[in-house]
């Protein structure tokens, strides 16, 4: 009887273990091939972004943004914006240049000073002693938060993060991310932005992904 009882307990334990194994899902750490719980299906795609292939460039645009016909900058060839907030948008500009590399413009800061029309007319860089932080002849202030230089496909790219603010700005300012490079006698610039309030409510991840995804062919 003891032997029979022992066998019964072992059998019950085996059945329980088997049931637990069947009911559990494959975790990412346990999935040897494919994706978790999707081993035999199609790979998952990032539905938050749409790949755009332009003339000589490609970029990932937030899927919920739509194309816009508004032309805001010289050489603009692409514009997408958030339907619910046009302050959140992406622009791609392509203009002729005699430079062989983006580094021929100088440092990222020096480059930005040569294309400061991207930040708004009469943008002022730095701090002012005037009340409200604005110079009498400036309609906007621009503070460079971060710059970076990276090599992508053998070409140097400039990345800049800039916070602009105007006297009548109700969003608290705009976070503007700029990616720039030179290829084949052309200057390529991608600028993605969002208002300060939306930036800290999650818009930053969409703007950052879009700006850093930009590359030339």
Curated annotation (Swiss-Prot):
<comment type="similarity">
    <text>Belongs to the PsbP family.</text>
</comment>
<dbReference type="InterPro" id="IPR016123">
    <property type="entry name" value="Mog1/PsbP_a/b/a-sand"/>
</dbReference>
<dbReference type="GO" id="GO:0019898">
    <property type="term" value="C:extrinsic component of membrane"/>
</dbReference>
<keyword id="KW-0809">Transit peptide</keyword>
<dbReference type="Pfam" id="PF01789">
    <property type="entry name" value="PsbP"/>
</dbReference>
<keyword id="KW-0597">Phosphoprotein</keyword>
<keyword id="KW-0793">Thylakoid</keyword>
<protein>
    <recommendedName>
        <fullName>Oxygen-evolving enhancer protein 2, chloroplastic</fullName>
    </recommendedName>
</protein>
<keyword id="KW-0150">Chloroplast</keyword>
<keyword id="KW-0604">Photosystem II</keyword>
<feature type="modified residue" description="Phosphoserine">
    <location>
        <position position="107"/>
    </location>
</feature>
<dbReference type="GO" id="GO:0015979">
    <property type="term" value="P:photosynthesis"/>
</dbReference>
<keyword id="KW-0934">Plastid</keyword>
<dbReference type="GO" id="GO:0005509">
    <property type="term" value="F:calcium ion binding"/>
</dbReference>
<dbReference type="InterPro" id="IPR002683">
    <property type="entry name" value="PsbP_C"/>
</dbReference>
<feature type="transit peptide" description="Chloroplast">
    <location>
        <begin position="1"/>
        <end position="31"/>
    </location>
</feature>
<dbReference type="GO" id="GO:0009654">
    <property type="term" value="C:photosystem II oxygen evolving complex"/>
</dbReference>
<keyword id="KW-0602">Photosynthesis</keyword>
<keyword id="KW-0472">Membrane</keyword>
<dbReference type="GO" id="GO:0009535">
    <property type="term" value="C:chloroplast thylakoid membrane"/>
</dbReference>
<comment type="function">
    <text>May be involved in the regulation of photosystem II.</text>
</comment>
């Amino acid at each position: 009887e003891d032997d029979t009882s022992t066998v019964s307990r072992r059998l019950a334990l085996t059945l329980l273990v088997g049931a637990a194994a069947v009911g559990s899902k494959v975790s990412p750490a346990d999935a040897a091939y494919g994706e978790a719980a999707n081993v035999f299906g199609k790979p998952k795609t990032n539905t938050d972004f749409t790949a755009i292939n332009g003339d000589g460039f490609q970029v990932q645009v937030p899927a919920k943004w739509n194309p816009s016909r508004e032309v805001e900058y010289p050489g603009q060839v692409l514009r997408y914006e958030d339907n619910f907030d046009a302050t959140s948008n992406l622009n791609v500009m392509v203009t002729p240049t005699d430079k062989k590399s983006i580094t021929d413009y100088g440092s990222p800061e020096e480059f930005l000073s040569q294309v400061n029309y991207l930040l708004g007319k009469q943008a002022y860089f730095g701090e002012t002693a005037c009340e409200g932080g604005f110079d009498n002849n400036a309609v906007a202030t621009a503070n460079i938060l971060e710059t970076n230089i990276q090599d992508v496909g053998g070409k140097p790219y400039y990345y800049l993060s800039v916070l602009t603010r105007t006297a009548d700005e109700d969003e608290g300012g705009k976070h503007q991310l700029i990616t720039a490079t030179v290829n084949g006698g052309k200057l390529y610039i991608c600028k993605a932005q969002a208002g300060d309030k939306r930036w800290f409510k999650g818009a930053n991840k969409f703007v950052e992904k879009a700006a850093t995804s930009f590359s030339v062919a």
